[in-house]
Amino acid sequence: MSLIKNFKHIIFSFSLLFFISCATTIDLNKDNKNNILDGLISNNPSYKSLDALLYVDIESQTMLHIKKGTVLKKYDISSSVYGTGSIANSLKTPLGKHEIYKKIGDKLPVNAILKGRVWNGAIATIIKDPIDTDYDHVTSRIMWLDGLELGKNKGDGIDSRDRYIYIHGTAEEGLIGKPAS
């Protein structure tokens, strides 16, 4: 299944999702993947009650789809080429807990190009080579994020929703796996 189809599957699969960015590496080679949330739960007991969450590991450029403590799928991602941070207009990937504010594009064709969260009628040509283009299309679907931590990713000058922070498709699939967004 292609990355875009997997991405589409994620969007349609959840009724409650959280996006967590952090710099902790998760070892997916552990024998018991059911215990992957142990470290997260010890710092955030409320995670134990979550049916599903997406966990983003900035260091390894991966996102895990976790359901009831079990890793269902690992996805390679691309965070911001400018690093991590929450300051408005910094173009950086914010850290911390987020929830999905809005899903956009559920009825659009795969690789539809969205500008300003609206399909412009065009379909992106997917670039499999590690080529950074000038256009950086947002494609297929958008999961618009809302920060949940006042002073970290929510509030004046640092608000993830106001900054239009998304999980989204890209035409530059050859760059996935390293900071390139």
Model-identified regions with their sequence ranges:
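N-terminal pre-domains immediately preceding structured catalytic cores
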Residues: C22-S181
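Bacterial N-terminal signal peptides
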Residues: I11-F19
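Bacterial N-terminal signal peptides that target proteins for export
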Residues: S2-I11
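A detector of low-complexity, intrinsically disordered, Ser/Thr/Gly/Pro/Ala-rich segments
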Residues: S2, F18, C22-A23
